[in-house]
Amino acid sequence: MKAQKGFTLIELMIVVAIIGILAAIAIPQYQNYVARSEGASALATINPLKTTVEESLSRGIAGSKIKIGTTASTATETYVGVEPDANKLGVIAVAIEDSGAGDITFTFQTGTSSPKNATKVITLNRTADGVWACKSTQDPMFTPKGCDN
């Protein structure tokens, strides 16, 4: 009788089935991880802009003169120090009223962010009293810590 050299067809089919089951579990979990990390990245991108807004308002610069961009600031106009497309996942916008109330938003773009985040928005909202709140239109599972839905 000859010694066996290799695997039988059934053994190979079992290995392929096991790999398929593991992939069916791992791929959705990885996609969820990516969506959560994108939310955290977006918030980390816009969170430092609060400091620039607060400094500008405390120097007496009107809220409507606080703009997005990296142009040098002047005595009457402040640029927050980032371009609208600073993060490849989406677009940043700053809209502050003269009262000091306003929003810093991050809008996820379709095609560059996870499909689970596409067109979702993270907003840092400032009241005229200087209180900041974070809101998100993301699924609660993907919303960064410190943000509400």
UniProtKB/Swiss-Prot annotation:
**Entry-linked InterPro entries:** N_methyl_site, Pilin, Pilin-like, T4P/T2SS_Core
Any one GO cellular component localisation term in the record: host cell endoplasmic reticulum membrane
In the record, the effect of residue 7 to C is given as: Loss of processing by PilD
Provide the alphabetized UniProt keywords.
Answer: Cell inner membrane, Cell membrane, Disulfide bond, Fimbrium, Host endoplasmic reticulum, Host membrane, Membrane, Methylation, Transmembrane, Transmembrane helix
**What transmembrane ranges does the database entry give?**
7-27
Question: Where does this one sit in the cell?
Answer: Fimbrium; Cell inner membrane; Host endoplasmic reticulum membrane
* Cysteine pairs bridged by disulfides in the record: 134-147
Q: Look up and give the membrane topology term.
A: Single-pass membrane protein
Coiled coil region boundaries: none
What is seen without this gene?
Mutants show a significant reduction in the efficiency of extracellular protein secretion. They are also defective in twitching motility.
Which domain of life does this protein belong to? Bacteria
Query: Which residues carry the post-translational modification N-methylphenylalanine, per the record?
Result: 7
| Reported effect, residue 11 to A | Decrease in methylation of F-7 and loss of pili assembly
GO terms, biological process = cell adhesion involved in single-species biofilm formation; regulation of calcium-mediated signaling; single-species biofilm formation on inanimate substrate; type IV pilus-dependent motility
Query: Does the record carry Disulfide bond as a key word?
Result: yes
The propeptide sits at 1-6
Substituting residue 65 to A results in: No effect on pilin-pilin interaction because the twitching motility is unaffected, but weaker Mat-pilin interaction and less detached pili during PP7 infection
Reproduce the UniProt comment on modification after translation. Methylated by prepilin peptidase PilD at the amino group of the N-terminal phenylalanine once the leader sequence is cleaved.
The domain comment in this protein's record states: PilA subunits constituting the T4P exhibit a classical pilin fold featuring an extended N-terminal alpha-helix linked to a C-terminal globular beta-sheet-containing domain, which are packed tightly along the pilus. The N-terminal helices constitute the pilus core where they stabilize the tubular assembly via hydrophobic interactions. The alpha-helical core of the pilus is surrounded by the C-terminal globular domain of PilA that coats the outer surface of the pilus, mediating interactions with the surrounding environment.
Protein family membership: Belongs to the N-Me-Phe pilin family.
* PANTHER family per record: GENERAL SECRETION PATHWAY PROTEIN G, PREPILIN PEPTIDASE-DEPENDENT PROTEIN D
Function field: Major component of the type IV pilus (T4P) that plays a role in surface and host cell adhesion, colonization, biofilm maturation, virulence, and twitching, a form of surface-associated motility facilitated by cycles of extension, adhesion, and retraction of T4P fibers. In addition, plays a critical role in type II secretion of exoenzymes by interacting with specific components such as XcpT or XcpU. Modulates host calcium signaling through interaction with host calcium-modulating cyclophilin ligand.
The record, for NCBIfam families, names: IV_pilin_GFxxxE (TIGR02532)
What is the protein name for this chain?
Answer: Type IV major pilin protein PilA
Source organism per entry reads Pseudomonas aeruginosa (strain ATCC 15692 / DSM 22644 / CIP 104116 / JCM 14847 / LMG 12228 / 1C / PRS 101 / PAO1)
Q: Which gene encodes it?
A: pilA
